[in-house]
Amino acid sequence: MKAARLQVIGTVAGLIGVWAMTAGGCANEQQKRGQELYAHYCMHCHGESGRQNEGFNWSSMPDPKPKDLSNKSEMGTFKDEDIFNTISRDMKDTSPGGDKIGDDDFAVPTMPTFKYTLSEDEIWSIVGYVRTLHGMKLEFKVEERKKELAEGLKTAQEKFESSKQAYEAAEKKASEEAEKKSAELKKDVDVDESAYAKEQAAMAQAKKELDAAQVTLNNFSGRPGKGGNVARPDMTATPDQAAQMAEVGKRLYQNKYGCNGCHSIAGEGGKVGPALDRAGFRLNATWVYRWIKNPQAMKPETRMPALGLSDADAKAVSMYLSTLRAPKAEEPAAAKPAS
């Protein structure tokens, strides 16, 4: 009996050990992936250890500079969700008269969003790695989040099927009533669409919710911009229209999308991406539009994130870049040989 009890205890202990190793392995894998993503997308500004003035681009960036991610006294005040939301927010126009910015909104244009570049799971991996830079661990239950999304999709599917059945039943009833009246009056009677309008609206709403739930679940594991080609835009505009768009684009370039955090003009700005002084000579406006709408569709491993530009914003920024036509830098004069 005692031997049997010991065998059971040993089996349970073994299972717990396997579970712990599996959980630990998942955590280690997540941290490793987060470190790789951080190195690719974040290190040039935030530095290898998250310290200020450590990344090669840090000193070139306009104020406010990137936070010290190694500072536990400050970073410890943020929840995991706060860090996630900072990395995956929508960009805000910080210009006077621009977007409304709430007290809790993070609105630093030079910190890009990765909402349209990385999967939700990948962003959580980055959050987990950032936590290690100030000696903390990710507390957010990522796997539970995935299960919730799967359950949400299942619920949305059931709701859609139910609303579809209700719509079809109401439409059938209205059609049968119209046929009955046609037979009685011996003339065609139109179906009363208002009789099933409520069910039709409910079905349409349920379909929207189903589509949204499907996209959210897809984006949890898959990158949102992968494989999404951008259609060629119509960039035709009168000179006055082009000038107005370029003026808007100049504002968006700096105050909404923070392009100056990575690119320089006239020596001012970041040095992650190429200088844009002569973009008007080097780059075609149509190509620029497609690139800034979805860089990953054109170059999957580029460090430049997709920032969620609307069509209008992408046209405006493209028009602004087309106006940048600085003269070529003069070649340094050859040194004269000593006489």
Show where each model-derived region lies.
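A generic secondary-structure signal for well-formed alpha-helical elements
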Residues: 41-49, 91, 134-137, 296, ...
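Conserved helix-loop functional segments at active or binding sites
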Residues: 51, 258, 298
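Post-cleavage N-terminal segment of exported redox proteins
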Residues: 1-30, 128-247, 318-339
